[in-house]
């Protein structure tokens, strides 16, 4: 991401969560705060943009639904935009709540974007410290949006501005009160935008300052990322959209490569969800177009 730009992917992800909360049923993940961070003008502008791009996504759907923009938007949201942000957030927060029961005291959200966890769970203010780590421009955008939405930043939420994929340092976290205690990390929608070497370095650095039992949930793209088409060519479209937005996808892994990367930093895979697993867990028995995204896997790994 360029220095003075906030992340387009954060806006699109928040839009997808807001759209799902408003218009889909049953809900995979209810981010009822996201709509407050995407103002009405942004919601309309992003909606219009997606509707206008329907020919890029699917020419047949563009023709069939040419007189029904709302159905076009629903198709784009459910096929292209929403599946991964919804399911990975649902999975991550389920794991987090289990980790809290097991004694985690800190939650570090890497690439937090417009995450709303703290605002949806005020009951955790006295038991969990939350550190949002992201590019300074993205954090400033979020702070502005929180102010516009009249949302007060809770006392347990700490903003840590850092371009962490390039140079990770614990110093800014320590300055915000981070302690050497059991910690849960999330790294969602990030791994495929950085190189293999940057992923390995980041994981190694993250777990150098936390005790055994600390863990991480992240998603990664498998080795078919740059060759798979997916439903309605959506995998190919995802790769092209990322490149066009200035945040190209850079890495993909086999399961064995991810396992080796984690083992090198002293982590064991506790749970791995393949696209089929994700589909069974989060998208079964639906009557709409939502389904797990091909090529994207979820991992929960724990420090030995």
Curated annotation (Swiss-Prot):
- The EC designation for this entry is 2.1.1.-
State whether keyword Transferase applies.
yes
In its UniProt record, which GO terms are filed under biological process? methylation
Q: Which UniProt keywords apply?
A: Methyltransferase, Transferase
User: InterPro entries of this UniProt entry?
Assistant: Ppm1/Ppm2/Tcmp, SAM-dependent_MTases_sf, SAM_mthyl_Trfase_ML2640-like
Q: Which residues are noted in the entry as S-adenosyl-L-methionine-binding?
A: 134, 163-164
Keyword Oxidoreductase attached: no
Q: Which GO terms describe its molecular function?
A: methyltransferase activity
Task performed by this protein: May be involved in polyketide synthesis.
Q: Which family does it belong to?
A: Belongs to the UPF0677 family.
Protein name, UniProt field: Putative S-adenosyl-L-methionine-dependent methyltransferase YktD
Q: Which organism is it from?
A: Bacillus subtilis (strain 168)
- Lineage of the source organism? Bacteria, Bacillati, Bacillota, Bacilli, Bacillales
